[in-house]
């Protein structure tokens, strides 16, 4: 099952984490600070294909493999696909309703499937509900949120892969 490493603001050895990913995996470079996001993208470039979160200008500038959009910008996918047809375009989603607007995307990251420390207080979908949602999606769905080596086996085959933060950091 392909893996997606989602970076966050913590100071971690993201390059080491990216090097450990199996072939076919990607890294989503996230972060609020544009200078830090640029520095991280430059560090990771060439280690694994990169999707830049919510920053199409940076994605184009560094020659990223694509763009990751927040759920609220999912409808922009067709625009970015037309402008950069070679890009992989993904988005986050948190409900079946959100996934119904995902037709122009290559994949969606559905979250949170399990309880997660990165979004304290967010109510998990649960594996059963998440599997139902993923099974009705018009595009491939990756499970995100609290996914670990211990609970990944509880995910249904309706998922195309796993996206994670903490469980992929060395």
Place the predicted regions along the sequence by residue.
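Conserved N-terminal beta1-alpha1 strand-loop-helix module at the mouth
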Residues: 1-77, 81-107, 122, 132-139, ...
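Non-cysteine beta-strand/loop elements that form the S-adenosyl-L-methionine
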Residues: 106-114
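Nucleotide-sugar-dependent glycosyltransferase donor-binding/catalytic pocket residues
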Residues: 115, 148-149
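Short, glycine/charged-rich beta-strand-loop motifs at protein surfaces that mediate ligand recognition
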Residues: 115-122
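Short, flexible coil/turn micro-motifs enriched in small/turn-prone residues
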Residues: 116, 140-141
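Short, glycine-/small-residue-rich phosphate/pyrophosphate-handling segment
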Residues: 125-129
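Alpha-helical hinge/cap motifs
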Residues: 143-146
């Amino acid at each position: 099952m392909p893996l997606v490493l989602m970076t966050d603001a913590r100071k971690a050895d993201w390059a080491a984490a990216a090097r450990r990913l199996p072939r076919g995996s990607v890294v989503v470079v996230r972060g609020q600070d544009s200078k830090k996001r640029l520095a991280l993208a430059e560090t990771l470039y060439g280690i694994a294909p990169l999707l830049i979160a919510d920053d199409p200008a940076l994605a184009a500038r560094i020659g990223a493999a694509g763009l990751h959009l927040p759920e609220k910008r999912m409808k922009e996918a067709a625009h970015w696909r037309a402008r950069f047809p070679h890009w992989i375009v993904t988005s986050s989603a948190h409900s079946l309703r959100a996934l119904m607007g995902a037709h122009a995307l290559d994949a969606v990251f559905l979250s949170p499937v399990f309880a997660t420390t990165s979004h304290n207080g967010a109510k998990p979908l649960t594996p059963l509900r998440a599997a139902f949602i993923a099974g009705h999606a018009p595009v491939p769905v990756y499970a995100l949120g609290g996914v670990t080596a211990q609970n990944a086996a509880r995910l249904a085959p309706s998922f195309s892969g796993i996206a994670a933060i903490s469980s992929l950091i060395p």
